[in-house]
Structures are given as C-alpha cells and as structure tokens.
Amino acid sequence: MAKQIVYGDEARAKMKAGIEKVAKAVSVTLGPKGRSVVLEKKFGSPLIIDDGVTIAKDIELEDKFENMGAQLIREVASKTNDIAGDGTTTATVLTHAILTEGIKNITAGANPTLVKKGIEMAVETVKEELKKMQRPVETKEEKAQIATISANDRMVGELIAEAMEKVGHEGVITVEEGKTATTELQVVEGMQFDRGYISPYFVTDSERMECVLEDCQIILADKKVSSMNELLPLLEGIVKNGRNFLIIAEDVDGEALATLVVNRLRGTLKGCAVKAPGFGDRRKEMLEDIAILTGGQVIAEERGMKLETATLDMLGSAKRVVIDKENATIVSGEGDKKKIEARAEQIRKQIENSTSDYDKEKLQERLAKLSGGVAVISVGAATETEMKAKKAKVEDAKNATKAGVEEGLIPGGGVALTRCEGAVGKLKADNEDVQTGINIVKKALTAPLYQIAFNAGLDGSVVVENVRNAKGNQGFDADTGEYVDMIKAGVVDAVKVVRIGLENAASIAATVLLTEALVADIPEEKGAAPMGHPGMGGMGMM
C-alpha cells in the first residue's frame, strides 16, 4: 500500500496536535475539583468517568499522524498505570508540558539529541529530590490519606486502609462490582500468583479480559500436558459433576490446549489453563502450597502418579478463581485449616534458617500468599454507570496506597514537584541545548499544580507563584481553597506514582522531540455510489 510521509516541524506539529487533544480531555479530571468525561460505548449506556488511563485508551483520532501522537500519550498513561497503578493524569499533563516547550525550542533551532540529554539530567535530579522528601507510610491513617486523595473519597480511603491492615502489605486486594448500593469490604482466604491464562480464549468477561470460575476444581500437574488423553478421565468426571475447572501445569500446549479452547468456545467445558508459578524447585514448592490451600494433591510422575489414572479426590477445590492475562487468584480454597497453618509454620522456619536475602524474600512472598488472604472490596452504586466510574477510582486508590507503602509518601497536590524546581534550577550544563532541556523540565514541574488550580476555577499562575514562595510542605488544598501544610492536611501522594509518571512523561516527550519523519498509509478513497441505469428515472412512480 502507498504511504504518505511528513517531515521535520510538520511531523512534530502533527504529533503534538494529537497529544494535545488527548491531554486536554484527560487533564480536566485532575484534582479534587476535576470534572468527568463521557465516553460513547458501541453497546449500552455511555461511560461517565474521571480515570485518566480509561479516557486516554478510548480516544482514536481520524488523522493518522495525529493519532500516532495520541497513541504515544496512551502509552504514557498505560505504562504508568501498569507499573504504579495510578497517576496517569499527572503523567499525561507532564508529557504535554514537556513536549510543548520542547517543540517550541527545537523549532527555534535547538538540537533534539542534546535537549533530550538535558531532560534526562533534570529528571534524575527530580528523582533524587523526591527521595529526600519522602517519609515512610507507617500508620493506618497515612494509608487512608493516600487512598482518599487518589479516589477523592474519604470512605473509600478508609476502606482500603482497613483492607491493607487485614491482609498485610503483601496480601492481595481485589475490587469487584457489588450487588447493593453500598461499598463493602470482605476478607476471604485466598492466594494470588503471577501467571495468567495460557490462551485469551478462556476469558469469560471480555470487558475486563478476565476468566472468572465459580465452584472450581483444580488439577495440579508437575509436568507439561500436550495430549488430551491425559486429561480426559478427569475432565469427564468434572463435567459430570457440573463443576468448572482450572489446570495448573508446567505448560499446556498442542492437542490438549487446542481441544480445551475449542470446547470452551462451544460451551461444552468451562475452565482455564495456566502455567505453574516459579521455576525448578521453587515451582514444586509453590504447587505444593496451592495443593494444601485447595485440599488437593500435586500429580507428579516422580511420585509414581499419572494424570490419566488420577482420581477426582486428588483435585483441589475453590469457591472462586479469577485469572487475567498476568495473575491468577484462588479465593476460598477448601483445604484443611490445620494443614495450611502447619505449612505456614514450616515456611516461617525456613525463613529463620535461610542465609540468602533472595530466598528469604521469596519465602516471605509464599508465606503472605498462603496466610495473608484476599481482601475483596465490593463497590456499590445506584446505577451501572456510576458503579463503573467508582470501581475505576477504587482500583486507582488501592494501587496508589500500595505504591505509597513501597516507596513512601510526599506532599500532594503538585507541591512536591514544584519544590523540585529549586534543585533543577541549580543544574548548570556547559552546552546551551542541554541547558534548554533542563529548563524545559523545570518549567513543566509546575504543570500539575497549575492544572489542579485551573480545574478548581482559579488562576493557575497565581497559585503556582504563591506555592513557590511558600516553604516546606505548604501548598494549595484545592478542595478547601486554602494554603495549608499538605502533610498535616492529609493531602499526600505516593513517591512511586509521581516518580513513574515523570519518568514515562519525559521518555515519551523526548522520543517525540527526536522524531524527524512520520510514515502512514494513504487513506483509501471511498468509491462513489453506483449510478442508476439510463431511463430508470422515477421508476414508474410519476
């Protein structure tokens, strides 16, 4: 297919236009007085949401070159969401700010490669400054503060803090749609491991790309499964009992996987296959953990056991299993409580005796998964539209709180980044274009604060200047419209969320600045409608 190409300033201008359109739609949601965005859905009612990553992912532009820019900013939001779980709107605002200044300077003749170097130097300095400002998250109240700011809802903040207290920092918190109008917390014993479905055809919820199996039997095999004949006797028994199944094995491929997928699509079988977590001896231990938790046995050939001769009483059971592309969560495993506690005690002793930090860390992870349980937050709302928006907020708040526990907290509301201006301002480069890159980041650091104030109906420039002249943790609380000590007022951010957002923003912005040409397919012209035959005129309808 023939291609169209644009070069230089025109290429960068096109990408900037696409980025600007997405950034404008996303940035209106920032801060406690941010607004919502309505997304059209092909089926069902529109989605009213103020979640940056959901908005960014939904935008597709008609102009192919502008759409390239839109896709890049979608990547900023997605990557920030994947790593930090929150802060996607801040990352989008920062990308737009760095890019706007960057393109202005490159159009004026600055060298993009040197400007990129300056941007990277400034970002490293900001990260160091954020480290100096951070303070550990120790109390339940501090966890609640981070979650409250993220969700803009005090009740959600307290619920997440309570969930973290109950399952511990290593425990798993899942968010699901509730069946009532109230949001509730329930702690269920369960385990999560980092292995997703082997094939996306196992998905039962296509919107969330998850496979959810209620009343599930679990086949645990310490081997690769390629032949369907090995599984057939067990699956026939499971189907006869009207239950769902989960296969956890070293791998499932070939004829076995193809047959499972075909039967899943036909609706004959409802189940899923995932690879066993870990490698080598650790995999054997983790399979044993799952077996004890679910009341099953690991079918291993080294023990003289074979899949084709295994019986149903060797299988584990769980009330619910949720598998996405990266994780599997087993909820309410039906194992013997005494055996689970004995296994946990065995792992605790192994931790005490271990001399390797790496082994200790992995053992602690296993212990948390075995004894921590799963906290389930059921999000309630009066309508489905409100529930979806609320659920996205709770997910973000949960991720922000976990990020806060990992790396600590800093003053929120854009104050921490504004305080980093001074350190970046002290950076002096020998080269003018490198210095330009440093100055670009310095100017962009106040963009989130400006946007928060603007969304609250105030003059962003005045608020930025007032915060700049204040000291320490003093900042602008957009919720009350007052200048307060942000830490004391509970307006805090997780260091990890801010750091990841800035890193991704600088990375994508610098990539766009280095762009010199864009190549896209030439849109196909739609053919004109076929003409009628001569003499068809009014078709006798005169």
Curated annotation (Swiss-Prot):
Keywords: ATP-binding, Chaperone, Cytoplasm, Isomerase, Nucleotide-binding. Its main location: cytoplasm. Its EC number is 5.6.1.7. ATP binds at T29, L30, G31, P32, D86, G87, T88, T89, T90, G413, D493. It is found in: Cytoplasm. It comes from the Bacteria. Pfam families: Cpn60_TCP1. It is an enzyme of class 5 (isomerase). One of its GO terms (biological process) is protein refolding. It catalyses: ATP + H2O + a folded polypeptide = ADP + phosphate + an unfolded polypeptide. GO terms for cellular component: cytoplasm. InterPro entries: Cpn60/GroEL, Cpn60/GroEL/TCP-1, GroEL-like_apical_dom_sf, GROEL-like_equatorial_sf, TCP-1-like_intermed_sf. One of its GO terms (molecular function) is ATP-dependent protein folding chaperone. Belongs to the chaperonin (HSP60) family. Together with its co-chaperonin GroES, plays an essential role in assisting protein folding. The GroEL-GroES system forms a nano-cage that allows encapsulation of the non-native substrate proteins and provides a physical environment optimized to promote and accelerate protein folding. Forms a cylinder of 14 subunits composed of two heptameric rings stacked back-to-back. Interacts with the co-chaperonin GroES. This is Chaperonin GroEL.
